[in-house]
Design a protein with these regions (language model features):
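Expand to "…catalyze enediolate/carbanion chemistry for C-C bond making/breaking, isomerization
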Residues: 16-17, 22, 26, 33, ...
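Adenylate-forming
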Residues: 25, 150-151
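Generic N-terminal amphipathic, Lys/Arg-enriched alpha-helix
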Residues: 2-20
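N-terminal glycine-rich anion-binding loops that anchor highly charged ligand groups
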Residues: 2-4, 24-55
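Active-site-proximal beta-alpha core segment in soluble small-molecule metabolic enzymes
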Residues: 46-149
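Short, basic, glycine/proline-bearing loop/turn elements
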Residues: 15, 41, 61
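Short hydrophobic/aromatic segments of transmembrane alpha-helices and their interfaces
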Residues: 8-9, 35, 103
Length: 151
């Protein structure tokens, strides 16, 4: 970025100001996707850092199978932007989250993750309330003690 452009950005927006060079972003997305393609693996980027439907759509256009969200609210924003292949990576607990999941599941088919029976029960209720099955990915602990289900 040139000094003149930096000065113009500071003058226009002040500081601090996040500036994203979309040419660099596009290059990085293409590079990450090419690595996945060469390895023969599906790319499902986690959007918890950028939280941007625009960037998520760029990732999908480059070849990502879908996206992964950390929270239900992130998934809702992505679904409202037209993204239809969404995994929610964390367990959703509580009646309020269950109701929100059912509401979103009526709009777009979701995949959720679970590592405990409480989450599975909540997902079953949400699927019944939505009148649509919910795909559940079971997270198993493979020795790193990051999950409640041990194999």
């Amino acid at each position: 970025m040139s000094d003149a452009l930096k000065d113009e950005i500071i003058k226009t927006f002040g500081t601090p100001c996040a500036v994203v060079d979309l040419n660099i972003v596009d290059h990085n997305i293409e590079h990450a996707q090419s690595l996945c393609n060469k390895a023969g693996v599906a790319n499902r980027p986690h959007i918890k850092t950028h939280k941007s439907p625009v960037l998520a759509k760029m990732q999908i256009a480059a070849g990502a199978k879908g996206i992964t969200c950390q929270k239900l609210g992130e998934a809702r924003i992505m679904a409202e932007a037209g993204i239809t292949d969404i995994i929610i990576a964390t367990n959703l607990l509580g009646a309020a989250k269950c109701g929100q999941l059912a509401s979103l599941q009526r709009q777009v088919p979701l995949k959720v993750c679970a590592d405990n029976a409480v989450s599975l029960t909540a997902y079953s209720k949400a699927a019944n309330d939505a009148n649509r099955p919910i795909d559940v990915l079971i997270e198993c602990d493979t020795g790193q003690q990051l999950s409640l289900i041990h194999i």
